[in-house]
């Protein structure tokens, strides 16, 4: 069956020592007085169940996951029979709509052309009681693959190929002007196994904690300027993989996504030094004070220069993606890894088919050097010549999408999730299936009243 990898975590990953520290895994799971809200939320989502139609062509097929504020379904396009994922959330979502934020991030990332390592946003809609989005249906995420196939850790040849792809995916996000801020194994997934064009591609997903780190430069068309770093930020992300700066409450930059990538790869390959520690402050001190050789002792030594490099960067600096990839490439060469070799979970038939598409399309991740040198943002210093008052309305130019995307061409929150109130949702009509089952409400949810400007 199809597995949705931008699934809803049902348990919190963050420390219980402080209610102000939130992981992205709270985006549906964490509710205020859930006992009092359950019934209301269920009413908000009652239309969204197998058999219901969206836009008169997407039919809900099966439930893939659910949490306190929303559900995820597999949906099928009844015109071309393609499958996708539906994520629907109650408007009672604490901290505001995660779907609005994800919509904004995905539109920015894909505005200059489809990016292979990022799910496509196919459609979004805002209703009176719920918001929903239809996105690319992916395969299993890296966390689930480890649990099923490699409980003692990924074999090095597979692990290093995953490492390179994850770096490419993160840089794609950075090149769009966004930070992900919740890098972890559950937020990366291989493509849908039924789609040979995507099956071997690792995708980055779940942008509910993302943040724009640049603004349009009003003095130069097509250029950007950095947002001024805030003096303090609340904890967000997932404590196991959060960067050292996050434990200090410091503003995050591109380097912090790479720190989280290092910790994520450490977790996939072996284990984290703080695996059995549940004290957030103690974990932060370990990340900040351990020498690189000690911190990276379970990883190939070729990767030690990565953390040494990261410690030299401030919040505005651009990471040296080429240096990082060179470290990965040394491991790739040392252990004679190959992009041609099948993955353990691929059948022989699927491996042959997927390889043919991989070689035919010349996937960028097999030779990422030129891409990693590109720097469309061109920011490596702080905004000394700009006033911090200019940062009140962050924007990076993007084409506003209000229509569905052809399927042939996918989503986490905190107490202070970046404001989504000005981000528009899709405007296409939501039309229920004619002659639908009695279990599906006969009347579709009504549109909310649009606020006056």
Predicted feature locations:
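Activation segment/activation loop of eukaryotic-type protein kinase catalytic domains
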Residues: 189-236
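ATP-binding glycine-rich loop module of kinase domains
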Residues: 77-101
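Structural motif in protein kinase domains
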Residues: 138-148
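Catalytic-loop of the protein kinase fold
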Residues: 174-192, 196
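Conserved N-lobe ATP-binding subsite of Hanks-type protein kinase domains
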Residues: 71
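Short beta-strand micro-motifs within the conserved protein kinase catalytic domain, predominantly
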Residues: 120-131
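Activation segment signature within eukaryotic-like protein kinase domains
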Residues: 162-163
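Juxta-kinase regulatory segment immediately upstream of eukaryotic protein kinase catalytic domains
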Residues: 8, 20, 24-53, 61
């Amino acid at each position: 069956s199809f597995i949705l990898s931008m699934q809803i975590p049902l348990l919190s990953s963050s420390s219980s020592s402080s209610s102000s520290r939130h992981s992205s895994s709270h985006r549906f799971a964490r509710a205020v007085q859930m006992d009092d809200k359950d019934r209301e939320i269920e009413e908000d989502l009652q239309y969204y169940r197998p058999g219901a139609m969206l836009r008169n062509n997407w039919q809900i097929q099966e439930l893939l996951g659910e949490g306190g504020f929303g559900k995820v379904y597999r949906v099928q396009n009844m015109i071309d029979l393609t499958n996708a994922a539906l994520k629907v959330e109650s408007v009672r979502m604490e901290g505001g709509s995660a779907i609005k934020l994800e919509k904004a991030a995905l539109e920015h990332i894909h505005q200059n052309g489809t990016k292979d390592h990022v799910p496509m946003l196919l459609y979004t809609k805002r209703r009176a009681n719920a918001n929903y989005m239809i996105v690319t249906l992916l395969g299993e995420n890296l966390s689930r693959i480890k649990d099923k196939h490699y409980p003692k850790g990924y074999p090095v040849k597979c692990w290093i190929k995953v490492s390179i792809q994850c770096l490419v995916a993160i840089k794609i996000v950075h090149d769009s002007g966004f930070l992900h801020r919740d890098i972890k194994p559950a937020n990366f997934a291989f493509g849908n196994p039924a789609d040979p064009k995507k099956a071997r591609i690792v995708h980055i997903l779940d942008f509910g904690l993302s943040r724009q780190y640049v603004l349009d430069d009003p003095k130069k068309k097509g250029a950007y300027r950095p947002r001024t770093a805030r003096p303090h930020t609340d904890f967000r992300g997932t404590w196991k993989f959060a960067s050292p700066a996050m434990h200090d409450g410091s503003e995050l930059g591109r380097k912090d996504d790479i720190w989280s990538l290092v910790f994520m790869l450490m977790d996939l390959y072996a284990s984290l030094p703080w695996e059995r520690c549940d004290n957030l402050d103690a974990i932060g001190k370990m990340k900040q004070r351990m020498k690189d050789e000690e911190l990276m002792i379970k990883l190939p030594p070729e990767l030690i220069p990565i953390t040494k490099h990261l410690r030299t960067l401030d919040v505005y600096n651009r990471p040296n993606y080429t240096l990082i990839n060179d470290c990965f490439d040394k491991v790739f060469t040392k252990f004679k890894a190959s992009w041609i070799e099948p993955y353990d979970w691929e059948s022989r038939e699927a491996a042959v088919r997927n390889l043919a598409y991989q070689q035919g399309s010349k996937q960028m991740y097999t030779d990422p050097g030129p891409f990693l040198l590109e720097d469309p943002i061109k920011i490596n210093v702080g905004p000394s010549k700009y006033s911090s008052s200019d940062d009140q309305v962050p924007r990076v130019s993007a084409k506003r999408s209000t229509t569905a995307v052809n399927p042939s061409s996918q989503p986490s929150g905190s107490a202070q999730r970046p404001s989504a109130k000005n981000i528009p949702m899709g405007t296409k009509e939501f039309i229920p299936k004619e002659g639908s089952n009695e279990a599906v409400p006969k009347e579709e949810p009504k549109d909310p009243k649009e606020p006056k400007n």
